[in-house]
Amino acid sequence: MTATAEGTAAPTTVTGRIARVIGPVVDVEFPVGSLPPIYNALKTEVTLGGETRTITLEVAQHLGDNLVRAISLNPQDGLVRGAEVRDTGAPIRVPVGDGVKGHVFNALGEPQDIPKSELQVKEYWPIHRPAPAFDQLEAKTEMLVTGIKVIDLLTPYVRGGKIGLFGGAGVGKTVLIQEMITRIARNFGGVSVFAGVGERTREGTDLFLEMQEMGVLPDTALVFGQMDEPPGTRLRVALSALTMAEYFRDVQKQDVLLFIDNIFRFTQAGSEVSTLLGRMPSAVGYQPNLADEMGLLQERITSTRGHSITSMQAIYVPADDYTDPAPATTFAHLDATTELSRPISQKGIYPAVDPLTSTSRILDPQYVGQEHYEVAQRVKEILQRNHDLQDQIAILGIDELSEEDKIIVHRARRLERFLSQNMFVAEKFTGTPGVFVPLEETIASFKAICDGEYDHLPEQAFLNVGNIEMAVEKAKKLQS
């Protein structure tokens, strides 16, 4: 499949007729020998209330007897049996190149913030593309410094890797993604592509306006398929955004950041489509090809020689159950996992990252250095010991602990609070400016706390500050 200008995809004259409509599933009959291939886009016009609009369908199955089963990517109001359907002769194509930056698109690549005639792009790429060949891949192990203490110290991100943000509803996944977009745009430049998959329309609007306000929109393309869209659209929006990102990586030779919010909605849409197509469900009602669908998306999000796509994916965990097949299938593809914890968020500690369950494959001396690794392990040991003592404290009280354990508990509470940090995107709510903490300062600050150098400071001084000097200043204000 090659890139084309929009007008050069030779339109076919093959037309069919709608034979059956069941919700978003449409069966279309074509002439003998003219069946469109799987994934081809079909177009039909409907008139409703005096207004004519185009509906796009995507071929999903060949049924026999010259029938294809397609999934509608638009609301299907107005579709009727016997209506004419045109085979476009190609899969869905989306615009690529510098012209997409600063604009909002739907899953079909249609701009939502400007008229299509004003979009200045020369090429359109099909959204169904093969993953890079094995000999083109490059495994990067360079750390991506975010300036967020808890992430840089305990779950360091890989430049060119896949990062998962796991958490239930309302623990801060979208806020953390917005924060990462802001930090990376401010500190690294480069191109970002955001895919809003099945999330709230309000959140999409907020994100667009915030990015406009912060001046990062000109280097970002946004692709949305929101909650009210048909399942076919929600299933394809991530592929549309990924195709735009692949162009920047492969043609313009740039490092790209791809944000997907929320990958669970991609799985959910696949489940809905699978049920509509009559497939037998598998575990917990998910589609039988769950791992295959996830693999087709994730294998394209990769680094090729010299250029990378770094992806950050928010992953909703249904009922906080990490054994659910949807989040469990995603785990296998990730280089780092950041788990957001409800108990931590209830303490008012943000970002609510669980330091004991979050992981990274590069938290290893050969990648991050011996000092970073040792400090991270000491922090985890203190926090783990504090966690183990909580039942004893709840039953007997903290006074019954040994002197050594009392010191560990008090130190752990300071570490917990010092893992919190003000966000740039939350400035308007908290009234406190966000802060970027260099990695060297993060390591030195946590090492000093673990060594007991700041045991004399009150716990509250460590909450929502940047480096340790800010905690000392806050302690002086609290004591005055």
Curated annotation (Swiss-Prot):
Enzyme Commission number, as recorded? 7.1.2.2
One molecular function GO term is:
ATP hydrolysis activity
In the bilayer, the protein is annotated as:
Peripheral membrane protein
Its annotated compartments are: Cell membrane
Q: Output the SMART domains linked to this UniProt entry.
A: AAA
Function of this protein? Answer: Produces ATP from ADP in the presence of a proton gradient across the membrane. The catalytic sites are hosted primarily by the beta subunits.
> What's the name of the protein?
ATP synthase subunit beta
Q: Record's superkingdom?
A: Bacteria
UniProt keyword list: ATP synthesis, ATP-binding, Cell membrane, CF(1), Hydrogen ion transport, Ion transport, Membrane, Nucleotide-binding, Translocase, Transport
- Could you tell me what reaction this enzyme catalyses? ATP + H2O + 4 H(+)(in) = ADP + phosphate + 5 H(+)(out)
* Gene3D superfamilies given in the database record: 2.40.10.170, Bovine Mitochondrial F1-atpase, Atp Synthase Beta Chain, Chain D, domain 3, P-loop containing nucleotide triphosphate hydrolases
Quaternary arrangement and interactors, per the entry?
Answer: F-type ATPases have 2 components, CF(1) - the catalytic core - and CF(0) - the membrane proton channel. CF(1) has five subunits: alpha(3), beta(3), gamma(1), delta(1), epsilon(1). CF(0) has three main subunits: a(1), b(2) and c(9-12). The alpha and beta chains form an alternating ring which encloses part of the gamma chain. CF(1) is attached to CF(0) by a central stalk formed by the gamma and epsilon chains, while a peripheral stalk is formed by the delta and b chains.
The protein's matches in Pfam families, at most eight in alphabetical order, are given as: ATP-synt_ab (PF00006), ATP-synt_ab_N (PF02874), ATP-synt_VA_C (PF22919)
